[in-house]
């Protein structure tokens, strides 16, 4: 498997994604950004339940709350648009990581989402190190070289 398999995804804009002006409602960009990194880690081989806790079975002792997010729009995104979504994760420090999502339409960047997550112990809510499997995904994604290839 090559990095582009989990770093480049597709998103089709649907009617329900848009507002009355016929362009995507702003909050959907952040939703799509989060969904894209979820899909990316699954394609990479990390089961979703290993990252996102199911409190009924308590499989995970780690949570990743969003501590900062941002959405930037460069051009309208409309119903029916087919977007390429490029994922660019990177580690900020031992407990913080950022996932950037670049939304490309016809070769042009039309939007960008940035989400920063903090790695916390589920019970104490203390900061803890990013787990190994997630760290491996970030390292394997190697944004500085692989994003150019994508």
UniProtKB/Swiss-Prot annotation:
Highest taxon of source: Bacteria
Family: Belongs to the 4-hydroxybenzoyl-CoA thioesterase family. DHNA-CoA hydrolase subfamily.
Residue ranges of the TM segments: none
Keywords recorded for this protein, A-Z: Hydrolase
Protein function: Catalyzes the hydrolysis of 1,4-dihydroxy-2-naphthoyl-CoA (DHNA-CoA) to 1,4-dihydroxy-2-naphthoate (DHNA), a reaction involved in phylloquinone (vitamin K1) biosynthesis.
Record SUPFAM superfamilies: Thioesterase/thiol ester dehydrase-isomerase (SSF54637)
Pathway the protein contributes to: Cofactor biosynthesis; phylloquinone biosynthesis; Quinol/quinone metabolism; 1,4-dihydroxy-2-naphthoate biosynthesis; 1,4-dihydroxy-2-naphthoate from chorismate: step 7/7
Record's catalysed reaction(s): 1,4-dihydroxy-2-naphthoyl-CoA + H2O = 1,4-dihydroxy-2-naphthoate + CoA + H(+)
Name of the featured protein: 1,4-dihydroxy-2-naphthoyl-CoA hydrolase
Molecular-function annotations in GO: 1,4-dihydroxy-2-naphthoyl-CoA thioesterase activity
Enzyme class: hydrolase
Biological processes, Gene Ontology terms: phylloquinone biosynthetic process
Residues annotated as the enzyme's active site: 19
Pfam entry (one): 4HBT_2
EC number assigned by the record: 3.1.2.28
Record-linked InterPro entries: DHNA_CoA_hydrolase, HotDog_dom_sf
